[in-house]
A protein has these predicted regions:
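Core mixed alpha/beta domains of very large multi-subunit molecular machines
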Residues: 50, 213, 218-248
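Phosphate-backbone binding interfaces of nucleic-acid-interacting proteins
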Residues: 1-224
């Protein structure tokens, strides 16, 4: 079972100990932690950028030469007179004024870390044109399987209260600056109260001898209305195979 420490922190009102210490306590009193994933490290260096310019590559039909605005957040990269960074991109959906995710030189492609063969980017020429890092697709960021184009960010993709800003840390913006603990499933077979982040948060509070208060929504009594309900008709077309069929 995967447990997000970011979610756990939202459910408690005390400070967690360092990750190594917390893992040790969980191992001793709850169950074995098979793996600890540091998402912040996986996405280290990834930045939100705006594509300011997009032109056809002079030496390749399927490549584009872009100029991106990273808010001057990344040091030690070549910039033009306007402070923009040049990146060559092969995605068919790249265009000016879109928002994308940039992996600058010295950063590592997140998907390659998961594959066990970390690939670190650098500044290099592609068909004679300098490209500083890459604009990433969903599969390269390990957030999806799409490789047909780069990730196109829009305001509706963001968590509430967040805004697209050039140079924003991708992991921090999307809540990926997190640790995920993978706790063995066998431990939970006799602990159905831990079948979820809330139950694990309660258990961690107990392990650390801290008080725990369930969120308000957890204690609300469910009320089922009968005035504005949507009409629902249910029929059983195969009673010989399904003698009892119910809808709730």
């Amino acid at each position: 079972m995967k447990v997000s420490l970011s979610v756990i922190k939202q459910l408690i009102n005390f400070e967690l100990p360092p990750v190594d210490e917390l893992v040790q306590r969980i191992n001793q009193q709850l169950g074995k932690v098979d793996r600890v994933e540091n998402l912040a490290e996986r996405y280290r260096g990834a930045r939100v950028v705006r594509v300011v310019e997009c032109a056809k590559h002079p030496n390749a039909d399927r490549l584009s030469v872009t100029k991106i605005d990273d808010g001057m957040a990344v040091p030690d990269v070549l910039r033009d007179e306007n402070g923009l960074v040049q990146v060559v991109c092969g995605a068919p959906n790249v265009q000016a004024d879109m928002w994308a995710v940039w992996l600058p030189p010295t950063s590592t492609v997140p998907a390659s870390i998961l594959e066990g063969e970390p690939f670190t980017l650098d500044a290099r020429k592609l068909r004679g044109v300098l490209s500083q890092g890459m604009l990433a697709a969903a599969d390269e960021l390990a957030i999806g399987t799409d490789h047909e184009g780069i990730v196109a960010l829009t305001p509706r993709d963001l968590p509430a209260g967040k805004a697209l800003q050039p140079g924003a840390d991708f992991a921090a913006l999307f809540g990926l600056d997190d640790y995920v603990l993978d706790i063995e499933n066998k431990m939970f077979t006799h602990r159905p109260d831990c079948f979820g982040q809330l139950g694990v948060a309660r258990e961690i509070a107990g392990i650390l001898h801290q008080p725990f208060t369930s969120p308000t929504w957890y204690n609300l009594e469910q009320v089922f209305g009968d005035g504005d309900s949507v009409p629902l008709a249910v029929s059983n077309d195969i009673p010989q195979l399904v003698p009892r069929f119910m809808a709730v």
